[in-house]
């Protein structure tokens, strides 16, 4: 029998993987919807524990279920405004097809709304987090999805929040504010 802390930890890790997969699939579906091709997807960080192909695209799975990315084809990424992709750094310039980029960036957050609804419904129905019941598993999944979704909206460069901020700035819908001295 596993120690009592191991089972909830494994459950939380599995919930994290599922939440991350749904989040990245939402980005992928949005890219396809607006006509932007992708060549691969990365799920998780750390050393790659599995590499293969899925639906004709490369798929890399990292050891830890945190952070993910949908990799756009370079020419499509350039067409919608991303620059300096080859160097590993990026910046965003607004252009005629740039309206597609915020849609792709926002799609992951929309998938996290599913987790929020799931959490609220399960909580109202009396679920308690854990592996003991189906309701507990749903509640745990909702908690993990909400937590990862909120972190992803923070405006750091590799997050969806950071990408959305860059899109708003490039579209001149957002201006930097200078502190008064």
Residue ranges, per PLM feature:
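Hydrophobic transmembrane alpha-helices and their immediate loop junctions
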Residues: 1-181
